[in-house]
Curated annotation (Swiss-Prot):
This is Regulator of nonsense transcripts 1. Residues 198-228 are annotated as: CC/SHH/C. Residues 54-131, 1149-1178 form a coiled coil. Residues 1092-1111, 1258-1268, 1284-1310 have a biased composition (Polar residues).
Length: 1331
């Protein structure tokens, strides 16, 4: 048993040995009494106090020792830390190709993170309760020997409240026993077979293989967080003092090591994964196919045969350290290797949470006060991460170019770094002497090239002269530059103090002030929508162009393949044509790749464009290098023989100039740069590059930011402070967003882009809806899950028929999900994951494509994990049977790197395959949306269907593939449908609604037309694709019921059902709500008052009751009932509607329930029994028997119509609650609606039907001036009375009519009522309302 006092330094504590009692059997009953006594608050009293005192005196020494141990244990448990909820995982963010050259790619190891927002006081109280229970529960129930080791009578006497405290000796101190040196540095477990030593030179600490309260074992957690990779076992363990290393090559990277068994010998051989275990072996007795990693990727722990897991008892007795404390302890160890848990509990200034971002701000000063600390915190965090990354023991080959600069070429591993190194980055090289470790030489250079074999070329001004030094004596470190943060902070300062930085409207719009109306710009709209080298714009693009050109602030949402680059180029061309004077257009994107692509397109349509690059990227190859500013300066310099050319030649010849010549050279170069910029029509730069001092002399009233959703809001602020008067943001917030490294900054809300915040403020984005990239079958799922079914394909199946002979399971649907069951493993860096099974299948698929004639450039491989990317690249080149150069030409990249790009065929490797650890950031719907929309002709997904299906979104995707018969397994030559049974996903939001990528709780509901592709709706939402208006008309023709008349009157009531879906068999409960609340005589109440409650589009995956059952329920409500029987009906009606699903199966259960109540409720229950039996009939049969009766019943007396009309006119709500279209037409609408109700009751009369149509048309004419309403699935209209105060709503009820049993519900007219916001009980109540 282990007990610890964490208030002591260096894992000090108490080691309590168990002493077996000689009389365990005889003392069991007494032991249970003692435990019960403790649980009852120490109220136990023995009958023989005198004997207990004698026993206490006789066993004084034993009792003192036991009591002291108990006191120390209590003190220890009081200092234990609370075990918070560990379900949250820390999502690691991966950047794209570059984000100001500071992107992160390879640290994608999901480590659990505790909630930082937990209340400290509540945590302390919960911790005390946990510690109390831990001692009296775990310490006594799990280790009974602690009590049995003492005389049980002395224990009873110890608990006697009559004993004097002096006899117990509670305060007598006892010397503490130090823990052994091999105790776990986290939890202090020190069982020899369960601990491992970290062999990093700066560490040397011991850690156990237990998890405690974390998801990874303590040794794995330490290795990952500290980036250490070498371990050794304890000298007294079963395997001795062994440093784990590869038997062949001596590799000590524990994340690469695994084991195999010899066929003829009873031995286990340790081999590294690559290259020893992946290549052929010379040892014939080794079974290379049996290789398994030493670290179980799913469990994140060492194999139990090598390092045992602490027992449950030992785990419960150990220090209960949380992941937050571990992370802080690792940070302290970087500064002080001897730091303890006591040190991390000291308050620190950086523990305070920064202020969260807001939707709107009072002024620019408040904006700056909130955002600036977040920028500084992100910069500090990035600086610490970059400067902590390094690689030692590298070998360098030196060369010298014609520019007199030196180039150092050396291999490096991308997966070993947390950041993606790209050309233009700065690195520092150091030469470490072989004796003493002294730095004898260092220099900083910039990366100029990285090839596919991970050979990096670094250009420096000098080279190391210590050629005699041994190989592997060089060290590489990353260099952090503050340029980005400095420019962002400068832009925020300008936003606050410079009035001329941007227009007044944009100032207030960015702050979220709604009072300033936009003033339309005087720009002539285009008449010709076709430009040279650009395709003709489609309807959605033309509509977006016309609205954007005259607006000072506009948003364009471009889903994948909809032509964002095309429309951006057209808008820029038109702005250049109509800008006044010397004004120029500034075009920005957050990444260099995106801005290069847009620069090339602008050059193709004939614009004078200049690409402004940073100084660090001037020597980096670019597809638009001829358009860059420094290359244009170089060309002009070569064409002439001026002073600048002479100085440049001198600098190239001698490597440097004198101080005077250098100043003159810089001045002449700057003057030429200004001349080129003045002649340009468009200047292109990254968002951070827009803050370049060379642009400070220019003003840019027209600014377009492409891919704006990938930039943080402060990053977009840099170009806007250049005199902006018109801003156009282009992007898609349902794809990947900004990349931030600091979790505190992300939690504070800075990860929300400016594009998203403006949508939340009510700015309506213009969505492009026609895509030109993907095969129609590939468009289906992304359209329905991310874009509400609006994304339609302009291409047909024949347009995307590649004529390939690849064995697709369904040739008409070129896609399939290949079910892989291989386990995931931790990558060589320890910060990522790999899946060797998926990599092997990927190589076979690539080989098949190449054999069938596909080119390497047509194939792209996407994986979310850097470790898998590196392993697939290496595995294809080693295992592929075709030419090596073919595999080298195939691009393997992360999801983030592929955003904005496309390939003919995409292979997606999901990697994650475990039972307990989850799927990490694969569950991000935006990342999945990007991965699924990169392919033009075919898509292949490799993953574990059973594991992935636990996530709701992935479950929908795999179900979609399964419904199309493309969920397969087996060999490529014989693919067959997989029989895998999908897991039941966790229900989201309590409504079964799929998440909308990039949309949060305050997302804006777009007012747009709905384009229904009529595909995939059954799979995604569990509802059919039939239009609600068509179904309503069909139902009205068949049943002629008043509820159908309400649906038939949708033109009168102006229902917006663009997004509506309806099903006769199984639909969601939210889509089956009555389209109008009715009174007992069958008239539509809300049509008299013209109150409309539009609800946002919503779908539900839960199946609900059929229309047939709702129709029966409605008919039951309309049956004439005696007044004395109203009360029983009120009691039973809510029960009847509690479970509308599967109505035909529930009838026998309800019938049994009514039969049991029949004995107690005689005549009243007998009548209800008959009504229940009538519901079993089909709607048309019931209609045939009750048609005449219903027609008479639904006839409303003319007197009541007049009274009702007068009453409604006298009780109209205030003007501010009315829509403008109702102000002048209330009386006409009431008369028309009354005529409609009368005409609909005589459905067989053609004249009345014609009158009804005329009335509909007249009402539509009266409403022609009404604004558009947002699309809804169905409109739930409630008949309510509204006073001047919204809180004083009163429901109107007619005293002459019988009341419905369910309570009435009233809501303000200005509110939107969403079906997804209703609980099941409220939904049932709304269905049965009666006025």
């Amino acid at each position: 048993m282990y007990g610890f006092n964490i208030g002591k330094a260096e894992n000090a504590g108490l080691h309590l040995d168990n002493k077996k009692s000689e009389n365990n059997n005889s003392s069991n009953n007494e032991l249970h009494k003692v435990i019960n006594t403790i649980n009852n608050g120490f109220q136990f009293k023995d009958d023989d106090d005198e004997d207990n005192e004698n026993n206490l005196n006789n066993e004084s020494s034993s009792d003192e020792e036991n009591q002291q141990q108990q006191n120390n244990n209590n003190n220890n448990n009081k200092n234990q830390f609370e075990d918070d909820d560990e379900d949250q995982e820390e999502e690691e963010y991966i950047s794209g190709d570059d984000l100001n050259n500071n992107g992160q790619e390879s640290d994608d190891y999901e480590e659990e993170e505790e909630d930082d927002d937990e209340d400290e006081e509540e945590e302390d109280e919960e911790s005390k309760k946990l510690n109390y229970d831990s001692f009296f529960g775990a310490n006594m129930s799990h280790n009974m020997d602690f009590l049995n080791s003492q005389n049980i009578n002395s224990q009873i006497g110890l608990m006697d409240p009559h004993l004097h405290s002096s006899q117990l000796n509670f305060e007598e101190p006892q010397e503490e026993i130090e823990l052994p040196a091999h105790a776990c540095a986290y939890c202090a477990t020190h069982e020899l077979s369960t601990v491992v030593k970290c062999m990093h030179p700066s560490c040397g600490k011991w850690f156990c293989n237990g998890k405690g309260k974390t998801k990874s074992s303590h040794i794995i957690t330490h290795l990952v967080k500290s980036k250490h990779k070498e371990v050794a076992l304890h000298p007294e363990s079963s395997f001795g003092d062994t440093t784990l290393e590869c038997f062949n090559c001596g590799c000590k990277n524990i994340f690469l090591l695994g084991f195999i068994t010899a066929r003829t010998e009873s031995v286990v051989v340790l081999l590294c994964r690559d290259p020893c275990a992946s290549g052929p072996s010379k040892e014939v007795n080794w079974d290379m196919s049996s290789w398994q990693p030493l670290i179980n990727g799913g469990e994140k722990a060492f194999c139990s045969w090598l390092v045992k897991t602490p027992s449950q008892v030992d785990s419960e007795r150990s220090r209960q350290i949380t992941i937050q404390q571990i992370l802080r302890l690792e940070e302290f160890w970087k500064m002080d290797p001897e730091a303890t848990l006591l040190d991390i509990e000291a308050p620190r200034s950086d523990d305070e949470k920064p202020a969260s971002t807001q939707l709107a701000y009072k002024d620019a000063y408040e904006y700056r006060e909130i955002i600036s600390p977040l920028i500084e915190l992100e910069a500090k965090h990035e600086k610490e991460l970059r400067e902590s990354l390094s690689q030692s023991g590298i070998s360098i080959e030196w060369s010298q170019g014609i520019n007199k600069r030196y180039t150092a070429t050396f291999p490096f591993s991308r997966s070993d770094l947390e950041f993606k190194v790209v050309p233009g980055d700065e690195l520092k090289l150091q030469f470490i002497s072989s004796t003493g470790g002294v730095i004898e030489w260092e220099d900083t250079g910039r990366v100029i090239h990285i090839d596919d074999e991970n050979l990096l070329s670094l250009e420096t001004k000098s080279r190391c002269s210590f050629d005699s030094g041994p190989k592997g004596s060089y060290r590489m470190e990353m260099v952090w530059r503050s340029t980005s943060s400095e420019r962002i902070l400068s832009a925020m300062k300008s936003f606050a103090i410079k009035e001329q930085a941007l227009s007044s409207y944009l100032y207030h719009a960015l702050l979220g002030h709604p009072d300033i109306p936009p003033a339309p710009l005087d720009i002539q709209l285009p008449t010709n929508f076709h430009l040279k080298n650009l395709p003709r714009l489609n309807e959605s693009q033309i509509s977006a162009v016309n609205k954007v050109l005259t607006a000072p602030l506009s948003l364009i949402q471009g889903p994948p393949g909809t032509g964002k680059t095309v429309i951006s180029s057209f808008i820029i061309h038109h702005l250049v044509k109509y800008v006044k004077g010397n004004d120029k257009v500034l075009v920005c994107t957050p990444s260099n790749v995106a801005i290069d692509q847009l620069t090339g397109k602008l050059h193709e349509i004939g614009l004078k464009v200049v690409r402004l690059s940073s100084k660090l990227r001037e020597e980096v190859a670019s597809p638009v290098e001829h358009l860059t500013l420094h290359k244009q300066v170089y060309k002009l310099d070569q064409m002439g023989d001026g002073e600048l050319g002479k100085l440049r030649k001198l600098k190239e010849a001698f490597g440097s100039l004198s101080n005077e010549d250098e100043k003159r050279y810089i001045y002449l170069r700057r003057m030429m740069e200004m001349a080129i910029l003045r002649k340009a029509d468009v200047i292109c730069a990254t968002c951070v590059g827009a803050g370049d001092p060379r642009l400070s002399q220019f003003r840019f009233p027209h600014i377009l930011i492409d891919e704006s959703t990938q930039a943080s809001e402060p990053e977009c602020l840099i170009p806007l402070m250049m005199g902006a008067k018109q801003v156009i943001l282009v992007g898609d917030h349902r794809q990947l967003g900004p990349v931030l490294l600091c979790k505190k900054v992300v939690d504070a809300g800075l990860s929300q882009s400016l594009f998203e915040r403006l949508i939340s403020l009510g700015h309506h984005p213009e969505r492009l809806t026609i895509q030109y990239r993907m095969h129609p079958s590939l468009t289906e799922f992304p359209s329905n899950t991310s874009y509400e079914g609006q994304l339609v394909s302009e291409l047909s199946h024949t347009d995307r028929d590649s004529q390939s002979k690849f064995p697709w399971p369904q040739p008409k649907d070129p896609m399939f999900f290949f079910n892989c069951t291989g386990s995931e493993e931790i990558s060589s860096s320890g910060t990522s994951f790999i899946n060797t099974t998926e990599a092997s299948i990927c190589e076979k698929i690539v080989t098949k494509f190449l054999e069938l004639g596909s080119l390497p450039g047509q194939i792209g491989i996407i994986t979310p994990y850097e470790g898998q990317r590196a392993y697939i690249t290496s595995h294809m080149q080693k295992s592929g049977k075709l030419n090596l150069e073919l595999y080298k030409s195939i691009e393997v990249a992360s999801v983030d790197s592929f955003q904005g790009r496309e390939k003919d065929y995409i292979i997606l490797s999901c990697v994650r395959s475990n039972d307990y650890q989850g799927i990490g950031f694969l569950q991000d719907p935006r990342r999945l949306n990007v991965a699924l929309t990169r392919a033009r002709f075919g898509l292949i997904i490799l993953g574990n269907a059973k594991v992935l299906s636990k996530d709701p979104l992935w479950n929908s995707l795999i179900s979609h593939f399964k419904n199309k018969n493309v969920l397969v397994e087996g060999s490529l030559a014989n693919l067959k449908q997989s029989p895998v049974i999908l897991q039941k996903p966790k229900k989201l939001y309590g409504q079964g609604k799929l998440p909308i990528p990039g949309q949060n709780s305050n997302s804006f509901n777009y007012d747009r037309e709905h384009i229904d592709p009529n595909i995939g709706m059954n799979m995604v939402y569990g509802i059919s694709n039939n239009n609600i208006n068509n179904n309503s008309n069909n139902i009205n023709n068949n049943n002629n019921n008043n509820i159908n008349n309400n649906i038939n009157n949708n033109n009168n009531q102006r229902f917006n059902t663009q997004d509506g879906r309806y099903s006769n068999s199984q639909t969601s409960s939210s889509s089956q709500t009555y389209y109008g609340s009715t009174n007992s005589s069958g008239n539509t109440i809300n049509s008299n008052q013209n109150q409309f409650f539009n609800t946002p589009s919503s779908y539900s995956a839960n199946t609900g009751s059929s229309y047939q059952y709702r129709f029966q329920q409605y008919q039951q409500l309309q049956q004439p009932q005696p007044q004395q029987q109203q009360q029983p009906q009120q009691q039973q009606q809510p029960q009847q509607q509690q479970q509308p699903q599967q109505p035909q199966q529930q009838q026998p259960q309800q019938q049994k329930q009514y039969q049991q109540q029949q004995q107690q409720q005689q005549q009243q229950q007998q009548q209800q029994q008959q009504q229940q039996q009538q519901q079993k009939q089909q709607p048309h049969q019931q209609y045939q028997s009750q048609k005449q009766q219903q027609q008479q019943q639904y006839q409303q007396p003319q007197q009541y119509q007049q009274q009702n009309q007068q009453y409604h006119q006298s009780q109209l709500p205030p003007k501010q609650y009315h829509n403008q279209r109702f102000n002048n037409n209330n009386n006409n609408n009431i008369n028309n609606n009354n005529n409609n109700n009368n005409n609909n009751n005589n459905n067989n009369n053609n004249n009345n039907n014609n009158n009804n149509i005329n009335n509909n048309n007249s009402k539509n004419q009266n409403q022609n001036q009404s604004p558009r309403r947002s699309p809804v699935v169905g409109t739930l209209q409630l008949h309510c009375k509204f006073d001047s105060q919204p809180n004083n709503n009163k429901h109107i009820s007619d005293p002459n009519q019988p009341q419905i049993s369910n309570p009435n519900m009233s809501i303000p007219l200005s509110q939107s009522l969403s079906f997804n916001d209703l609980s099941q009980e409220q939904f049932n109540k709304s269905n049965s309302r009666k006025d």
